[in-house]
Amino acid sequence: MKWVSALSRQTDIDGAIQEAAESITQQLGSDQADLTIVFVSPQFKEFYDKVPDLISRYFKPGLVFGCSGGGIIGNGEEAEQQAAISITSAQLPGVKIQPLQFETTELPDQDTSPSVWREWLQVQVEDNPHFVFLADPFSFQGEEFLAGVDFAYPNSKKVGGLASGAQALGGNALYLGNKIYNSGLVGIALSGDIEVDTIVAQGCRPIGEPMQITQCEQTLLKELEGKPPLKVLEELHETLSDADKKLLQTSLFLGIEMDPMKDSPKQGDFLIRNLMGVDRESGGLGIGALLRNGQLV
């Protein structure tokens, strides 16, 4: 088993993929991989559909899997707010890689048995699979999906994240094989000679006080306790230290209460979600999760 990674900051899509792909083949010592994971910055959104074919032009990638991303990480480097592509490839002898793709409209009912979820995913629990999922936050109900997968595969590891870089539905890219999707979820189930360890990649320190959502529409947060979210942030900004004011500009996230039955939620009781954009006309915020009125954030 071998994993290698490369990142290119070239501003030309062909040149960026060629540079990253040549680094991959050099590190692998081969032009053949079993799995290739690709992340593409939104500066290349006009060329999202070219990515799988371009990768295949330079080496045999195996199954291509990935998505668009506002920040791109590869080979120990990170690129934000600039053109970038990262490619991670693996040679995985003895590992079964099963591609998965779903839309929220297809989800089984939450009250169904584990066997119904397993039949729907078409992944054998006896294979002891581990999962990697990438979802579009504007169209996919990730919490409901993960609750069902946890129910059906309690001993399996599940890792992944949200596609980003877009401000609205249809603007992100999800890659699976030679296909590109603009909504839903793509994933892979890994089984056989492989172990998966999980870590939490992101932790946050709370600022301000918990507030209740009083108006929202899908992923758009319109109102917090009667105020536009942007107004809440402006008021919060005035109370922060200079260091936190700088962090507010680049590292702001929203915490969503995980268990509404808790009387006094504390740090650690909130699910961290990305801010996807700002509607300055209404003062609303785009959030990387489907919201509902009454949630505490």
Identify the function of each model-found stretch.
Residues 1-49, 54-57, 62-63, 67-72, ...:
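Small-residue-enriched flexible segments
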